[in-house]
Amino acid sequence: KRVDFLNFAVSELSLKNAKAKHLRAEEAGEKLLRGSADVVVARAVGQTNILLELSIPLLKKHGIFINYKGKDLSDVETAKTAEAALNAKKTEVFNFCLPFDVGERNIVVYEKIEDTPKIYPRKFGTIKKNPL
């Protein structure tokens, strides 16, 4: 349903070169969409090192990964090994507070600086057991 809505929005807004697909990120990053996206977005769904391994392979060189996080950024600092292995670099962190005292949030932006080694992304079970 979410993908249907996103494709409807793309159509209504007459966006060119934009489409929503329902895929597992690790499958898309292996072959289908590897190196094809200008921007990948994730919202507070997991550890940063795991999200990087799933998202960075989808990006073109100099593409941007936008990671919407909660208040706690401790896992961002521990993801430096993943950044190096995947040829990505943290470029910006935007901190803000939601209205009505809902809480503090962060947007962490990464750039893919070189092609991702072909060994990434690994199978999801491997990523979970042995994160970068």
Q: Can you name each region flagged by the protein language model?
A:
Residues 2, 72-75:
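Short gly/pro/ser/thr-enriched loop/turn and capping motifs at secondary-structure boundaries
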Residues 44-45, 70, 114:
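Short glycine-/small-residue-rich Rossmann-like dinucleotide-binding loops
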Residues 80-132:
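SAM/dcSAM-binding transferase cores
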Residues 17-19, 64, 89-92:
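Conserved beta-strand segments of alpha/beta enzyme cores
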Residues 7-12, 76-86:
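Active-site-proximal loop->helix
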Residues 1-46, 52-55:
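Conserved SAM/SAH cofactor-binding pocket of Class I
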Residues 59-61:
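Helix-to-beta-strand junctions that scaffold the AdoMet/dcAdoMet cofactor pocket
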Residues 68-72, 96:
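Short strand-turn motif at the edge of the Rossmann-like AdoMet-binding core
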